[in-house]
Curated annotation (Swiss-Prot):
Family classification: Belongs to the calycin superfamily. Fatty-acid binding protein (FABP) family.
Name the record gives this protein: Fatty acid-binding protein
Assigned keywords, A-Z: Allergen, Cytoplasm, Lipid-binding, Transport
Annotated domain remarks: Forms a beta-barrel structure that accommodates hydrophobic ligands in its interior.
Pfam families: Lipocalin
PROSITE patterns the UniProt entry points to: FABP
Subcellular location, principal: cytoplasm
Length: 64
C-alpha cells in the first residue's frame, strides 16, 4: 500500500529550476526552505493526497 506520510529529504538542482522559472532570489530562498510533507490515504477506490508546507497546503481527492 502507499498509505502513509512522506517528507521531502532533498531536492537536487531546485534553485536552478526555480531560477529558470524566473523567480527572484527572495522567492527562491523561501521555496527552498520549505520542506513539504505529503500524506497519502487510500479508501477503496478513493485516494486523497494532502501536501503541507510552511508556504502552502493543498488537498486533492479522486477516484480510480
Amino acid at each position: 500500500q502507499i498509505n502513509g506520510s512522506y517528507k521531502l529529504e532533498k531536492s537536487d538542482n531546485f534553485d536552478a529550476f526555480l531560477k529558470e522559472l524566473g523567480l527572484n532570489f527572495v522567492t527562491r530562498n523561501l521555496a527552498k526552505s520549505a520542506t513539504p510533507t505529503v500524506e497519502v490515504s487510500v479508501n477503496g477506490d478513493s485516494y486523497t493526497i494532502k501536501t503541507a508546507s510552511t508556504l502552502k497546503n493543498t488537498e486533492i481527492s479522486f477516484k480510480l
